[in-house]
Amino acid sequence: MNQTLMEIKERALSQINASDTLDALNEIRVNFLGKKGELTSVLKSMKDVAPEDRPKVGQLVNEARESLEEALESKKEAFGKVLREAKMKAETIDVTLPAKKPMLGHRHPNTIALEEAERIFVGMGYEVVEGPEIEYDYYNFEALNIPANHPAKDEQDTFYVTSNILLRTQTSPVQVHVMEQGKLPIRMIAPGRVFRSDEVDATHSPSFHQIEGLVIDKNITFADLKGTLAEFAKQLFGEETKVKFRPHHFPFTEPSAEVDVSCFKCGGKGCRFCKGSGWIEILGCGMVHPRVLEMSGIDPEEYTGFAFGVGLERIALLKYEIDDMRLLYENDMRFLKQF
């Protein structure tokens, strides 16, 4: 029996070492350790062994089985290693090869226009200040001398969150917050998103951007306002640009004006771009109303100031000759990659 076990073990180990595929290895496992395998048959014949020899023979059979199982597992792991190495070699990526470049975005016209405007005003000593887009009714209207019965407060024009909280319709509330801090003098601009209940078309959107400006100091006059906006227009549209102030009305400024610039396409001669007038409207402005100063805790007898507001999209549309505001929000790369 001992001799038979040794022969079976040596033959099995020899076949295991010579095997070159997993299928061959599995076949060896079945032939020697399966239900009808040679080693299993020896185990079944234990009934024919003398009782006193059974423990010894049983031990030898178990040792042979353990030896074969260990050899089979070791060979299986070797096959697995070879397969993994072959797979890794087949899937190897040459990192030195030139990669496909990802699609790059482009700077948005609004971003370019905002950075240009900020550069101009910061160069004149202005500070850039931001404020909340969700605002109290008081800061959006009453603190700006817009009474409770003013048409602008109508729900058809304003997005209300509650009866006294709304989406700001202008960035002017930022000016009020700054004035309430009482740190004078003030020289600031407040760029940001605003919201109005407008239908979407070529020139309107329910969400757009404004840049509001404010200067508060002693002895500020309308001449300071004119000089500031004239310089802004020249830096934005060119040194030959002229400005024209037309009387207007805003609740928070007195006197108030709308500002036109000479058409930078035709030099003021009249063309399709300026609709033949030679002038293009760009912003509204005026001297800060004394009541607005009072409500923010500033003495209008000692301090005066001016304010102005310009639509950021308006600047982008003019500078880049875009005829439809909706193009700014459609995220069409064919359009945006031009900038």
Swiss-Prot record:
GO molecular function: ATP binding; catalytic activity, acting on a protein; magnesium ion binding; phenylalanine-tRNA ligase activity; transferase activity; tRNA binding
Cofactor note: Binds 2 magnesium ions per tetramer.
Keywords: Aminoacyl-tRNA synthetase, ATP-binding, Cytoplasm, Ligase, Magnesium, Metal-binding, Nucleotide-binding, Protein biosynthesis
Main location: cytoplasm
InterPro entries noted in UniProt: aa-tRNA-synth_II, aa-tRNA-synth_II/BPL/LPL, Phe-tRNA-synth_IIc_asu, Phe-tRNA_ligase_II_N, Phe_tRNA_ligase_alpha1_bac, Phenylalanyl-tRNA_Synthase, tRNA-bd_arm
Subcellular location(s) of the protein: Cytoplasm
One BP term from GO: phenylalanyl-tRNA aminoacylation
Enzyme Commission identifier(s): 6.1.1.20
Requisite cofactors: Mg(2+)
GO cellular component entries: cytoplasm
Entry keyword annotation includes Aminoacyl-tRNA synthetase: yes
Catalysed reactions listed for this entry: tRNA(Phe) + L-phenylalanine + ATP = L-phenylalanyl-tRNA(Phe) + AMP + diphosphate + H(+)
Chain sites annotated for binding Mg(2+): 254
Quaternary structure and interacting proteins, as annotated: Tetramer of two alpha and two beta subunits.
Family in the record: Belongs to the class-II aminoacyl-tRNA synthetase family. Phe-tRNA synthetase alpha subunit type 1 subfamily.
Protein name, UniProt field: Phenylalanine--tRNA ligase alpha subunit
Species in which this protein is naturally found: Lachnoclostridium phytofermentans (strain ATCC 700394 / DSM 18823 / ISDg) (Clostridium phytofermentans)
Higher taxonomy: Bacteria, Bacillati, Bacillota, Clostridia, Lachnospirales
Gene expressing this chain: pheS
